[in-house]
């Protein structure tokens, strides 16, 4: 199964620890979505936004990995699954079930994401824009 990570799961160390079978394939961009931070947990989320882009990491994961991600993402309470096609391939990601106002992430959580951006060689401008710094 193909999985699109855009938040803390971009971090290769964390992803491998959580999902032992996972393999990072490449960086990709999800068009017409934007990255934001929401909920009392101040967690990363994506929402539809015309002419916006969310960079992320494409991972191959096993069924066992998917079950572990479901637990981590508090599926189906906090996050729901969202599927999209990318060059004919079906890809799964998570998006929050309840959209709340923007909440700045904790420093610890943000550092995990920053490491993930580095691991996946993503442009930080997207993260800075989501944090309302740009």
Map each language-model feature to its residues.
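Glycine-aromatic micro-motifs
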Residues: 1-134
């Amino acid at each position: 199964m193909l999985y699109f990570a855009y938040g803390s799961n971009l971090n290769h160390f964390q992803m491998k620890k959580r999902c032992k079978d996972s393999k990072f394939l490449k960086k990709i961009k999800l068009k017409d979505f934007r990255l934001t931070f929401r909920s009392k947990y101040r967690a990363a989320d994506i929402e539809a936004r015309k002419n916006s882009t969310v960079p992320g990491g494409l991972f191959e994961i096993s069924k066992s990995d998917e079950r572990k991600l479901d637990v981590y993402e508090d599926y189906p309470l906090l996050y729901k699954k969202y599927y999209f096609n990318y060059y004919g391939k079906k890809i799964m990601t998570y998006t929050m079930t309840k959209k709340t106002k923007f909440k700045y992430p904790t420093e610890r959580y943000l550092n995990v994401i920053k490491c993930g951006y580095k691991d996946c060689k993503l442009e930080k401008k997207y993260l800075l824009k989501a944090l309302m710094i740009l």
